[in-house]
Every structure is written in C-alpha cells, then in structure tokens.
Amino acid sequence: MTQKNTGPRRRTAVACDRCRRRKIRCTGSDIPGQPCLACQKAHADCHFSTTSWRACRKKSAPLHCPSTNGKTNVLPSYASTPSLSPMTSSHFPYASDGTLISATNHCDDCSYNPHYLPVNSNGSSPSHTSSLDSIPGYASGSGPFKTPYRPVAVSESSSRSSFSMGSSEFASSTWSQSPMQSSLYVSPSSQPLDRFSPASFPSKETLTSSSLSSSVPRSVSLSNFADSNTSNYPESSLLPAAKVGNNGFVGSNVLGSMSYSNVEDSVRFQTDSVSQMSSKSLEHLPMLSEMTLSSSASFGASVSPKSTPGSNSTGAAVDTNSVHSNGGSDLDYSSYLTDSSAVDSPSLDADEVLRSFNLANDPIGAVDPLTLEIDQGSGSQLLGQQSFANDSLNAKQSSGKLGPLPPQSFNSSDYISFDEPSRYLSDDASLWPDQYVDKVQPLATMKTCNPAVFSSNTSLDDMFFFIRDFDEDHPIQTAY
C-alpha cells in the first residue's frame, strides 16, 4: 500500500477572489505566484487582491486637519457653559481658556470657506473686534456674558439695535454690518404689547386726511335736527328727513337741517320738492312745455289740457291760460298723444265723464290702471299720474257702448254691493241676443258684506272660501 506524500497544508490569511466569492477554504501554494489548489483543480485563474476587505476597516481616529507645517491640530476641549440664552455654546464654542474659536472649520488653510472666521492669537475675530468689545460680556476676551438678553427691536434699514438688559449702555450698542448680524437669533418679547400707550400707535403726522381707513371718524352733532315738537315724536330726531334741493336735478339731494313733527309733514314736504324739481327739469323740453305741473299735498299729476277742471281726482288743476304760452309755437303737440275726436264728440255727456273720474261716487271700475293705491288702512290715498291716452280711453268706456267688466277690489267692505245690478253687466248684456240672455235678478238677501269678513289684512284664500260658500247658498243665473 502506497501513501501519498502531499505535505502539510498551507494556511493563508487571505483567500483568493474566487474562493472568497464561493466561500470555500483557500489553500495557498508553496511556490509564490502559483494558484491555490482549488483554482488548479478548476483550471481557473487565481488572483489575490492587493487590498482585502479587512484593510477597508479603519479604526476611529480623532478629527484633525492637516496643517502646512505637517503638525496635527487636535480640537481643544470645550468649556462647559450653561445655556442661558438662545445663543448656546454650540453656536459659539469656547476653549477652556475662555477664548472664542471658530464654529465651522478649525484648519489654518481653510480660509476659502466664506463662513470661516479666522481667529487671532488673542482669541477674537478681527472683523468683530469693535462690535464684540462694545458688549459688556465680550470685552477683553472675558468669555460669554451670564445675563440672558432679550432684543426689543431689530431695524433692517439701520445697523442700530436697542436691547433691554437692564443697563443703559447696552441699549445704545452699535452693530456693524457683517454676516454674523444676519445669523443672530431674535427671540420674541415676553412682555405683551401695551395697546394703550401712545408709543404703540403712529403719530398724527402719519395719518393723512385722504386715507379713509386710518382717519378717525368725527362725532356727528344732532343739534341741528332738534325741534320744539321732537319731545312728542322721538323718531323725528333720530331719523331726520332729507331736504331735497329745489334748484338741482333729481339726483342732487342736499341734506338739510329741518325737522318735522310727524311723518306726514315730512312726506308732504318731500313730494312738493319732487314736483317742483320735475317741473323745472322738464321745462326745456318743447313737447312738454304746454303742460303745467302744479304741486299739491301729494305727487302732482299731469292731465290733458282738454279735460275739465273737475275731472282730476288727485287735486291737480289745469291752467288754461298757460296753454301754448311756454312753448311759443302754434303746433298742438297734444294732438299726437290723444284722440281729439273722442273728446270733442257731441254725444259725450259731461256727467258720464265726471262719474267715470269721480272715485267717491263709483269706486268700482273707475280706478285707472296706472294709478297707485297706497295706505288703504289709514286713508286710501291715491297717488299717481294720468296720461292723455288714459283720459281718452276712460272717456270711451264711459260712453255706455263698449267696455269690459272692470276688476273689483275686495279690500274694503263698501266696494261690494249686491242691492242693484251692475251697469257694466247690463251694458254688455245688451250686445247679446235675447234668446241667450237671462235677466239678472238682484239679490236682496245680502245688502252689504260683513265688515269683519273682509279687511285690509284679508288674504286671498279667505276671500276664495267666502265666495265659494256664498255661491253655494245663493246661486246666480249667468248668461251662456
């Protein structure tokens, strides 16, 4: 039996690259430069790296910066100073001897850094010698000050800053323009702002009269609106009526100092002023120069010059002497607005015209469509204007030949009456043939409506139910 003499196994400290990747044991060769046994069997290239993975591991060394003279400058130990202000020792490190050192780099050849502040032998920055010496804590390199400071105001336009530290000399310290000034931390003031002190508000010179937001409103005196009758009517002093100027147009209102004893006097004065303004502002128009606008207790109504003086229900009279006097021309402009043939008709009765315009005698159907009915509960005062065309239309309807059934008003109990047939219904019934018309019988069962049923505050639903119940109890024969 033969025995192989392989020799002792050689152990290497570093494996080849192939064995390291395969994580197998690498046995080196006795001859330098020869591959290992594993690579020889595999006929692979055996390569040993010059720098192994263990060589990459470096032990932790103290931070140092290379110097020009080849020496190593080790960082000095920091002095343990308590943090008494927002500017702690981390922002401004100090050595054990109390001198200020650089906060960024500590190399002698690092002057290219813009944030680097070179340190002199005395331990202070040359660019901040004058500014740091003005502070009591930094004078003659005595180290940081022990009293916490609180900046009051930092002005961006000037380099002066006032601080409250309890000393008068520190309040007037002057800081030079430097990068350190922009890096200072400004802490908020712990004292609240005194809003009642005169220093917290701008002076009177800064307040301009043209600025509405900064100007202080003046007090308004209501003594001009006081009157002897204001004791009985307190609302007249609180809400004074505006006096309308008579010489201007409609838009030029002037606040007057007159007061009125009640609301009716105020309305009467304002309506008179509006009527006078309307007459003066329309005098330059040639088409309206023939009319005379007269003011009364209410709005003055413009009526036709050809109408009778008693036909106007609002109280406006027609001045026949002033017709064709203001215009100065012979052309009758009223012929373009009205139909003169209907007014000058010989068959037209004056009593019919008077009855059609008299609201007190015949309130049903005599209300003009353009007439405004206001204040029904107090006095049923009618205000408005009547044109020339409306006068001729009412004159045609009052002739007794044609005319639709006018709308009835249920606001007052006096307007509803069933004791006599309506004349409008009889006039319309005369147009129908006799065989299709049943004579309307007057109702004597109900003379007038109950005043409690209809009032000025009655809704439409209440009137509807009342009429429906009344029709069921009293049927009315109608024409088909």
UniProtKB/Swiss-Prot annotation:
Residues 298-325 are annotated as: Disordered. InterPro entries: Zn2-C6_fun-type_DNA-bd_sf, Zn2Cys6_DnaBD. Its main location: cytoplasm. One of its GO terms (biological process) is regulation of transcription by RNA polymerase II. Residues 16-46 bind DNA. GO terms for cellular component: cytosol; nucleus. The keyword NAD does not apply. PROSITE patterns: ZN2_CY6_FUNGAL_1, ZN2_CY6_FUNGAL_2. Keywords: Cytoplasm, DNA-binding, Metal-binding, Nucleus, Transcription, Transcription regulation, Zinc. This is Uncharacterized transcriptional regulatory protein C2H10.01. It comes from Schizosaccharomyces pombe (strain 972 / ATCC 24843).
